[in-house]
Amino acid sequence: MISGVGALIGRLVWNSQQVDPARSASLAYQNAVTAVSEGKPDSIPAAEKFAAENKNTYGALASLDLAQQFVDKNELEKAAAQLQQGLADTSDENLKAVINLRLARVQVQLTQADAALKTLDTIKGEGWAAIVADLRGEALLSKGDKQGARSAWEAGVKSDVTPALSEMMQMKINNLSI
């Protein structure tokens, strides 16, 4: 009986040690993101510090939020750096795909089409095929490769794509003819 109670107490202590760091990271992430979205002074440096110190999913998510702030301010180099940091902080393949998609968009805006194409090559999974095709078309078009862009968008239209994205890619194909 006593050993059973001891084991139960030990298990509860161990569980609390595992849950408490996750809770505090979650709370710190929420506070950082809220402060940034509210435009509080010094919130961006604090969020950057949080992202740099948390080499986990919360750090990666903070990097995504920061990258959006930098894109909104047209600070694209800073956005790209945050996205690269976010990639290093997560092992989740879907989160990596989202980060890589955003990174490729930023790279296209920075006229780094070759880097964007390499970034897009790292995204795996059929669920991402249409979005990757759309961005691939944008990157190729920015390099002046109209035929490559057309091929990418045509492949995107043929993939399992939402009607809205399909129509948008079809409009891009049609605009190449003009």
Please state what every model-predicted region is.
Residues M1-Q17:
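Single-pass alpha-helical transmembrane signal-anchor segments
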Residues L12-S24, A51-K55:
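TPR-adjacent "capping" and linker segments in tetratricopeptide-repeat scaffold/adaptor proteins
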Residues V19-R23, T57, N94, G127, ...:
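Residue signature of alpha-solenoid helical repeat architecture, marking inter-repeat boundaries
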Residues A22-D42:
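Short extracytoplasmic/periplasmic juxtamembrane "stem" segments immediately C-terminal to an N-terminal membrane anchor
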Residues V36-S37, E48-A52, G59-I131, R136-A139:
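Alpha-helical adaptor scaffolds
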Residues D42-S43, K78, A115, G148:
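Alpha-helical positions within canonical tetratricopeptide repeat
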Residues S142, K146-I178:
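Terminal, low-structured helical/coil segments at or just beyond the last alpha-helical repeat
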